[in-house]
Swiss-Prot record:
<comment type="function">
    <text>An essential GTPase which binds GTP, GDP and possibly (p)ppGpp with moderate affinity, with high nucleotide exchange rates and a fairly low GTP hydrolysis rate. Plays a role in control of the cell cycle, stress response, ribosome biogenesis and in those bacteria that undergo differentiation, in morphogenesis control.</text>
</comment>
<dbReference type="InterPro" id="IPR006169">
    <property type="entry name" value="GTP1_OBG_dom"/>
</dbReference>
<feature type="binding site">
    <location>
        <position position="193"/>
    </location>
    <ligand>
        <name>Mg(2+)</name>
    </ligand>
</feature>
<dbReference type="InterPro" id="IPR014100">
    <property type="entry name" value="GTP-bd_Obg/CgtA"/>
</dbReference>
<dbReference type="InterPro" id="IPR031167">
    <property type="entry name" value="G_OBG"/>
</dbReference>
<comment type="similarity">
    <text>Belongs to the TRAFAC class OBG-HflX-like GTPase superfamily. OBG GTPase family.</text>
</comment>
<feature type="region of interest" description="Disordered">
    <location>
        <begin position="127"/>
        <end position="146"/>
    </location>
</feature>
<feature type="binding site">
    <location>
        <begin position="315"/>
        <end position="317"/>
    </location>
    <ligand>
        <name>GTP</name>
    </ligand>
</feature>
<dbReference type="InterPro" id="IPR006073">
    <property type="entry name" value="GTP-bd"/>
</dbReference>
<keyword id="KW-0963">Cytoplasm</keyword>
<keyword id="KW-0460">Magnesium</keyword>
<dbReference type="InterPro" id="IPR036726">
    <property type="entry name" value="GTP1_OBG_dom_sf"/>
</dbReference>
<feature type="domain" description="Obg">
    <location>
        <begin position="1"/>
        <end position="159"/>
    </location>
</feature>
<dbReference type="Pfam" id="PF01018">
    <property type="entry name" value="GTP1_OBG"/>
</dbReference>
<dbReference type="GO" id="GO:0000287">
    <property type="term" value="F:magnesium ion binding"/>
</dbReference>
<dbReference type="GO" id="GO:0005737">
    <property type="term" value="C:cytoplasm"/>
</dbReference>
<feature type="binding site">
    <location>
        <begin position="284"/>
        <end position="287"/>
    </location>
    <ligand>
        <name>GTP</name>
    </ligand>
</feature>
Amino acid sequence: MKFIDEARIEVIAGDGGDGSASMRREKFVPFGGPDGGDGGRGGNVYAIADRNINTLIDYRYAKKHMARNGENGRGSDCYGKGGDDITLRMPVGTVVTDMDTGELIADLTEHDQQVMLAKGGSGGLGNLHFKSSTNRAPRQKTDGKPGERRMLRLELKVLADVGLLGMPNAGKSTFISSVSNAKPKIADYPFTTLAPNLGVVRVGPSKSFVIADIPGLIEGAAEGAGLGHQFLRHLQRTGVLLHLVDLAPFDESVDPVAEAKAIVGELRKYDEALYEKPRWLVLNKLDMVPEDERDARVADFLERFGWDGPVFQISALTGQGCEALCYAIYDYLAEHSDAHRAAEEEDLAADVRFRDAPPSDGGATSGGDA
């Protein structure tokens, strides 16, 4: 299935039904009084996170989603039926934003998390409500309220603990396939990876973390070169970034230091917060460097790159150094996960508007069709 991580949709909640202006008509009851019922409420539109969905492709083509209107009230004190709700199933990690106001409506981070996107209109009042001691036969009634109508932007950000950065052919796909259960396409040409890949790395019976591989970046990605830099959004939820560098490029004219600096520059252009995220340097393809030259080549790279953070030397192809790197990642995540989660929850509490859950009897369900 094609990977789609962005879509724009319109959601329209149902209108409330109109109240009824009716009088009781019954044999031997000459002055029956008002008996007009209220209109039914309009249906709501909900989003629910589903871990079995991993793309927004349904919403790329089905752009309008409408809940049903409430029915009008009738005589004999009959209330109109409420409109059926609809539920839109979306991947875990979807962010929903109102395109007109910029309001963050929902951040779906957990399976089965449910959020109201548009509220149905309330039903109108029947003339039964307007009866008084001075007005025994009221003709007044009210119309139902219109439901909310919104243009929404859906943006999928994959949920991972670790993100991989690097130029095309830096060995990111080889690394993730070496340390996890992911099976990405691997080939000796650039841009083999066209969509994010997720893999689970296990360092013990109950110890694991999720790693995300995104398509490679090149210099000028911010201006649309290569595949652009839009896939960087999938690294925004990670706890640490691994910057993979090809220390032994096939083309001897390619300077690994210049390529590494270009990646950092593109990262900063895209998002300052992502640039400030903890980042580790991973020097890959050591198996391609003669053993007696490794120390000198690594030292030269670090000096010219000006790096003073964590450094790991690996060969993703042979597995050399990968186990130590994975254990270091797990220890770091275990130490920092509580603080990272608390900060994320604090941000969401300030921005995300959660609404009431739908009634227990529920309504219609949609997987992307209106």
